[in-house]
Amino acid sequence: MRDPLAATSRNWKGVARRGAAVVVVAGVAAIGLRELVNSSTFQLFGDYVARVETADRVVALTFDDGPDPWNTPKVLDVLDRQSIKATFFMMGRNVERHPAVAREVMRRGHEIGNHSYSHPKLVWMSPGRVREEIERTDKLLRDIGVSGDIHFRPPHAAKFIVLPCVLVQMKRLSVLGDVDPEEWKRYAAPVMTESILRQVRPGSIIGLHDPNGIETLRTLENILPALTTQGYRFETVSQLVRRRS
């Protein structure tokens, strides 16, 4: 005679196994989605660049989150001493607060890009909100004299469906990067220096943050002569992008 308790036990074990499988698949999917959303080198669609394929030893040096009245001028001085031009992806609200610093970046011959107005994660925002973040910053940059194409870099490198859709509609390039020393972890300059020099390749886009403090400045002072000694030249993002086939 069939034991109903044993049958029930087997059924529950089957349910438990299927439930565990669902949890595992959901967990893997969530991790994959998070990696996709926050990837600094990949975007689902649209025109984007994280590195340019080239045999020439050229790199683009980029700075996010400025302008900052204390640290951005120090970064500019370090770049001036090496005669190097970079690209600064600025937050609109910081341009609004410190327009003179933004103009100084431009006066010294550097490129300026758009890093949104308020630095939100644009992943789950409506298309209208995303467009407002971009267009509001565009206007502020035009007001200080920026001309030509204004490239865009997603805050937190976060993007999924909505942001690429908006950028496609606006015919805008999304600038990511393949060299990230993870400044947010508060590493010391020697650690970040080693990380950058290990990751860099011809056509790389290096990501730093000009509002960060002394460790970022020391890292910059380390990598510029080191990369120059290795035969690298520095270009703006626009110059590097023109090398794409």
Where do the protein language model's features map onto the residues?
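Terminal accessory/targeting
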Residues: 1-62, 73, 77-87, 198-245
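Active-site beta->alpha N-cap acidic-glycine motif
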Residues: 37-129, 133-140, 148-149, 214, ...
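Active-site beta-loop-alpha junctions enriched in small/polar residues
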Residues: 25, 66, 91-93, 117, ...
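Short beta-strands and strand-loop turn motifs
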Residues: 60, 113-116, 175-181, 204-209
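His/Asp/Glu-enriched short active-site or ligand-binding loop at hydrolase and phosphoryl-transfer sites
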Residues: 158-199, 232-243
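Cyclic nucleotide signaling catalytic output domains
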Residues: 151-154, 244
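Soluble catalytic domains of enzymes that build or remodel membrane lipids, polysaccharides, and related
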Residues: 123-146, 163-175, 193-196
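Generic recognition of short, well-ordered alpha-helical segments
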Residues: 73-74, 100, 125, 162-165, ...
